[in-house]
Design a protein with these regions (language model features):
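Short acidic, S/G/P-rich loop/turn micro-motifs used as interaction or catalytic elements
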Residues: 30-34, 65, 221-222
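Short acidic-hydrophobic, aromatic-tinged amphipathic segments that line or gate anion-handling sites
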Residues: 8, 80-85
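Thiol/selenol-based redox catalytic cores and closely related redox-interacting motifs
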Residues: 85-221
Length: 246
């Protein structure tokens, strides 16, 4: 069983995050990691609901203040709910995977992880972004104009022509990831001040008011920030449904 003391000690110093209320703590990996951006983008729309049901939210990522500022401006995640660490000490203390480790350093390891080596589930998740997923919600409103910074802007209604609506259409999630990738690569050193931790994985810790764990997930590989990637916030259903019913 994981010793949560390093996390609880950290939270005790953060106003509103000590014991007494349920807390959702997101250990993002690097600020420039696909998982970090995609997880934040999934969370932003439900933050008001989590506030209403009394769940306090804090994200802790590897990076620095400049990276955190840009990350929040791009994803819409509240800056006051994001803290940064210069290294992966907290992640390691909480049992999060360091990712593939090779004598050649982090870059060869990262490339292999992107190919699914030492990164369970990555290739299947990449493919899902292109093929679509009827279990998942659509990513773009049909009235939206999609801008990736790479392709010419186009109406999101094109996805409806490709596969329908009210579910994740072919190429839709891949387009979200292309936009995220373009943002990170254009500002790499802002998002990733040190390459030492580019393979580090993150985790999710949902704590009860008495500090006992309600839910824990540790990422096993790239694009693995949830056990249910088609609905990454499914673990919050009991609280989100309670808010919807209120």
């Amino acid at each position: 069983m994981t010793d949560l003391h390093p996390l609880l000690s950290r939270l005790a110093a953060v106003p509103g995050m000590d014991a007494g209320a349920p807390r959702l703590v997101l250990l993002f990996s690097q600020l420039g990691d696909f998982d970090s951006l995609e997880y934040a983008q999934a969370l932003v729309p439900v933050l008001p609901q989590l506030d209403r049901v009394g769940i306090q939210v804090l994200a802790i990522a590897i990076g620095d203040g400049d990276g955190a500022d840009r990350f929040c401006a791009f994803t819409g995640f509240p800056r006051e709910r994001l803290q940064v660490e210069a290294d992966a000490s907290l992640h390691r203390a909480l049992g999060c995977s360091p990712g593939l480790q090779l004598p050649g350093g982090p870059w060869p390891a990262l490339f292999l992880m992107c190919a699914g080596i030492g990164s369970p589930g990555t290739l299947a998740e990449v493919v899902r972004g292109y093929t679509g997923d009827r279990r998942a919600p659509q990513c773009f409103d049909d009235e939206a104009v999609v801008e990736t910074g790479v392709l010419p802007a186009f109406p999101a209604a094109l996805f409806q022509r490709a596969g329908g609506h009210r579910f994740q259409r072919p190429f839709e999630l891949a387009t979200v990831r292309l936009r995220n990738m373009n943002e990170v690569l254009r500002h790499w050193r802002t998002y990733v001040p040190s390459d030492r931790f580019i393979t580090q994985r993150g985790g999710t810790f949902l704590l009860a008011a008495d500090d006992s764990p309600l839910y824990i997930h540790r990422d096993r590989g790239i694009l693995g920030f949830s056990a249910t990637m088609h609905r990454p916030l499914a673990f919050l259903d009991p609280w989100l449904q309670a808010d919807a019913a209120a």
